């Protein structure tokens, strides 16, 4: 164990916190193909805000590089690259394959490659390992080995950090499984769970987020029903929540790099073996349609107040996929922006957490620096940033015209302080 030198490949929201924790204990090389990312990390800056300068400094054994040759001294490679979906909602393994190609070029006999990226069951051994074999010329489970330990990072969550979240581990042989588990036990104070196989660990990860996606879909459907009945959904959920085993989910937009993406990995694999999943895809359709539903509700409310919709101005408060973090990946707030444009509504997006450069690069959106007072026909509270909560209803209302509609998607305000709630 003492001889293990770790390389963490991919230094985003998942890889960097992991590299920092290992860097407090042993030699670690953090690798990323983004040279700008490496430059900022070398300066002690993390633009994702997951790790602060003090934590980076504390990881005294951690170095950063974009040079693949610097990984030759490592014998354990942990892959933490994104696993997105394409425009057809099919798994896009390109980052994973490219990372495997790179590692294959520096892989040596006895080395171990551990994947943390969310995949469908079988991806590690069926998709990644052959790439490692091809580019290294080595044989799997003879010359090199594999492990899988799914990430459970929750971006922006300062309470549930890498070390305090229980970790599932696995390996391609019983001996490697034990070694992988021992390695993670060095940094995971919450403990580990050694799965019986890599496929079991892969499946466990993908159903964690699929289950959450379906639970939110159920609550979203209930919210639509209760809205038609004139019943406040939050009040219903509070009442139902008094029973000990009622699960406290809330309605809303389902975006981000995990919950709105991972179910498609599982359904893809299911379809490839001849099974068409009904419930999982139904939940995805419902959640993917929430942006359009929100806009339809807003437009109806505006029409009831005789607010002219064509050419109206709407302020969208929040663009990130979740509160109090700058992560824009797969944010479903963009669906609201696009749907409003279908009504020829002018949209201003305000989000103090977002880099204007990132918003333009990812979605072609230029956020406003400061919203104009008395300028908007509609205001949508789309993300529960602390800044918005601290503003209070009165200050938020001041941004609207004398006649406007305030739609609170996130229950940031008391029921009587907004005009619409999800």
Swiss-Prot record:
Transmembrane segments: none
Enzyme Commission number(s): 1.1.1.136
Alphabetical list of InterPro entries matching this protein: 6-PGluconate_DH-like_C_sf, NAD(P)-bd_dom_sf, UDP-Glc/GDP-Man, UDP-Glc/GDP-Man_DH_C, UDP-Glc/GDP-Man_DH_C_sf, UDP-Glc/GDP-Man_DH_dimer, UDP-Glc/GDP-Man_DH_N, UDP_ManNAc/GlcNAc_DH
Pathway: Bacterial outer membrane biogenesis; LPS O-antigen biosynthesis
Catalytic activity: UDP-N-acetyl-alpha-D-glucosamine + 2 NAD(+) + H2O = UDP-2-acetamido-2-deoxy-alpha-D-glucuronate + 2 NADH + 3 H(+)
Entry-linked Gene3D superfamilies: NAD(P)-binding Rossmann-like Domain (3.40.50.720)
pH and activity: Optimum pH is 8.5.
Temperature dependence: Activity is relatively constant over a wide temperature range from 37 to 56 degrees Celsius. Optimum temperature is between 37 and 42 degrees Celsius.
Biological process, per Gene Ontology: cell wall organization; lipopolysaccharide biosynthetic process
Highest taxon of source: Bacteria
Active site as annotated: 258
Pfam families: UDPG_MGDP_dh, UDPG_MGDP_dh_C, UDPG_MGDP_dh_N
GO MF annotation list: NAD binding; oxidoreductase activity, acting on the CH-CH group of donors, NAD or NADP as acceptor; UDP-glucose 6-dehydrogenase activity
Keywords for the protein's UniProt record, in alphabetical order: Cell wall biogenesis/degradation, Lipopolysaccharide biosynthesis, NAD, Oxidoreductase
Record: residues binding NAD(+): 14, 32, 37, 83, 118, 329
Description of the deletion phenotype: Deletion of the gene causes deficiency in B-band O antigen biosynthesis. Mutant shows a defect in flagellin glycosylation.
Regulation: Requires either potassium or ammonium-containing salts for activity.
Miscellaneous comment text of the record: Whereas either WbpO or WbpP could initiate the two-step biosynthetic pathway of UDP-GalNAcA, the kinetic parameters of the two enzymes indicate that WbpO acts preferentially before WpbP. WbpO was originally shown to have a higher catalytic efficiency with UDP-D-GalNAc as substrate. However, a subsequent study showed that catalytic efficiency is much higher with UDP-D-GlcNAc as substrate. This discrepancy is likely due to the requirement to refold the C-terminally His-tagged WbpO enzyme during purification in the first study.
Record NCBIfam families: NDP-sugDHase (TIGR03026), PRK15182.1 (NF011729)
Biological function: Dehydrogenase required for the biosynthesis of the B-band O antigen of serotype O6 lipopolysaccharide. Is also required for flagellin glycosylation. Catalyzes the conversion of UDP-N-acetylglucosamine (UDP-GlcNAc) to UDP-N-acetylglucosaminuronic acid (UDP-GlcNAcA). Can also catalyze the conversion of UDP-N-acetyl-galactosamine (UDP-GalNAc) to UDP-N-acetylgalactosaminuronic acid (UDP-GalNAcA), with low efficiency. Can use NAD(+) or NADP(+), with a preference for NAD(+).
PANTHER family the UniProt entry points to: UDP-N-ACETYL-D-MANNOSAMINE DEHYDROGENASE
Family in the record: Belongs to the UDP-glucose/GDP-mannose dehydrogenase family.
Entry protein name: UDP-N-acetyl-D-glucosamine 6-dehydrogenase
Native organism: Pseudomonas aeruginosa
Gene that encodes it: wbpO
């Amino acid at each position: 164990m003492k001889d293990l030198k770790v390389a963490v490949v991919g230094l985003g929201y998942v890889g960097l916190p992991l590299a920092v924790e290992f860097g407090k204990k042993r030699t670690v090389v953090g690798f990323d193909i983004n040279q700008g990312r490496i430059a900022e990390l070398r300066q002690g800056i993390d633009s994702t805000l997951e790790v602060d300068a003090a934590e980076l400094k504390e990881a005294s054994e951690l170095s950063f590089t974009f040079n693949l040759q610097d990984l030759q001294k490592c014998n354990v490679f942990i892959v933490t690259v994104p696993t997105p979906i394409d425009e057809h909602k099919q798994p896009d393994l390109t980052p994973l394959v490219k990372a495997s190609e790179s590692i294959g070029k520096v892989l040596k006999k006895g080395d171990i490659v551990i994947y943390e990226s969310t995949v469908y069951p079988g991806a590690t051994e069926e998709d990644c390992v052959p790439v490692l074999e091809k580019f290294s010329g080595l044989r799997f489970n003879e010359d090199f080995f594999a492990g899988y330990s799914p990430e459970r990072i929750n971006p922006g969550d300062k309470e549930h950090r890498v070390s305090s979240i229980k970790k599932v581990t696995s390996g391609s042989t019983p001996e490697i499984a034990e070694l992988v588990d021992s390695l993670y036990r060095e940094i995971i104070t919450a403990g580990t769970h050694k799965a019986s196989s890599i496929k079991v660990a892969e499946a466990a990860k993908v159903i964690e987020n699929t289950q959450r996606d379906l639970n939110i879909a159920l609550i979203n459907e209930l919210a639509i029903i209760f809205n038609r009945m004139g019943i406040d959904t939050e009040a219903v959920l509070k009442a139902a929540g008094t029973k000990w085993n009622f699960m406290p989910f809330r309605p809303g937009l389902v975006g981000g790099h995990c919950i709105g993406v991972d179910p498609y990995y599982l359904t893809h694999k299911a379809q490839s073996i001849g099974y068409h999943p009904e419930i999982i895809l139904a939940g995805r359709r419902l959640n993917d349609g929430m942006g359009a539903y929100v806009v339809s509700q807003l437009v109806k409310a505006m029409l009831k107040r005789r607010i002219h919709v064509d050419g109206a101005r709407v302020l969208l408060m929040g663009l990130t996929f979740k509160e109090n973090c700058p992560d824009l990946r797969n944010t479903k707030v963009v669906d609201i922006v696009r749907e409003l444009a279908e009504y020829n509504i002018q949209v201003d997006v305000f989000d103090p957490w977002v880099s204007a450069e990132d918003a333009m690069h990812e979605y072609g959106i230029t956020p406003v620096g400061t919203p104009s007072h008395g300028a908007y026909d509609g205001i949508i509270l789309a993300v529960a940033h602390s800044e918005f909560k601290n503003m209070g209803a009165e200050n938020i209302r001041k941004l609207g015209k004398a006649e406007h509609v305030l739609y609170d998607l996130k229950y940031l305000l008391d029921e009587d302080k907004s005009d619409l709630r999800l």
